[in-house]
Amino acid sequence: MMISHKIKEGKPMTHIARDDAITLLKKYNQDPFHIQHALTVEAVMKWYAKELGYGDDAEYWGIVGLLHDIDFELYPDEHCIKAPELLREGGVGEDIIHAVCSHGYGITVGCGKTIDVEPVHEMEKVLFAADELTGLVWAAALMRPSKSTKDMELKSLKKKYKSKGFAAGCSREVIERGADQLGWELDKLLTMTLEAMKATEDELSLIHISEPTRLQLIS
């Protein structure tokens, strides 16, 4: 499956209101963990947009983050394959669809297909790189006495990152490919994503996570 539409010069081609995006997300996702992850990636993407000079498009970057896993709960074996259908039914434009699908680039999903929608714009590359990493940072925060990212140092995150058994579901290979696509050293990606999560933690109320969700994060 290939979607040829590309974001032109990083400018939003279409827009869906955030309230409508939330409604669309919840139409296909009920698990609190999946909703929390979507909100986390939304907040991190908005932070990156502002940090990287795309502040005028921060809401747009956030919507892409919010909807990026729209098909994962109901169609895990068709992740990034079923998404275009669900998004088009919700009135979402092809630029957002391309961005959503591109975060699965090079990944073979359960049905045996490999996603070939390549991240092109910096926004898409950030989504690819930061998606998995937000889960790892979050899991690391929950292991701390404070249950917070705010007092987490980079060296602590790197220690967890290097422990292959920790948050094993967060693919280091994907994270490192993401850093490469951005032309960044891994340390830069780790540093910036940690800073993004520190900056947005109060908004996301990371310390108020139920035990079942906590277990999902660290498994």
Regions found by a protein language model. Give the residues of each.
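Methionine residue identity
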Residues: M1-M2
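Divalent metal-dependent catalytic cores for phosphoryl transfer on phosphate-bearing substrates
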Residues: Y54-K164
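Acidic/His-rich, divalent-metal-binding segments that scaffold phosphate/diphosphate chemistry
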Residues: H5-Y75
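Single conserved hydrophobic/aromatic residue that forms the stacking wall/gate
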Residues: I207-S219
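Active-site hotspot residues in diverse enzymes, especially metal/ion-binding acidic/histidine motifs
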Residues: A43-E51, E173, E185-T200
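Divalent-cation-assisted or electrostatically stabilized phosphate/pyrophosphate-binding catalytic cores
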Residues: T149-T191
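Predominant activation on well-ordered alpha-helical scaffold segments within soluble catalytic domains
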Residues: I22, K26, L39-E42, K46, ...
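Electropositive phosphate-/nucleotide-binding environments in soluble metabolic enzymes
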Residues: H15-D19, I35-L39, D77, D151, ...
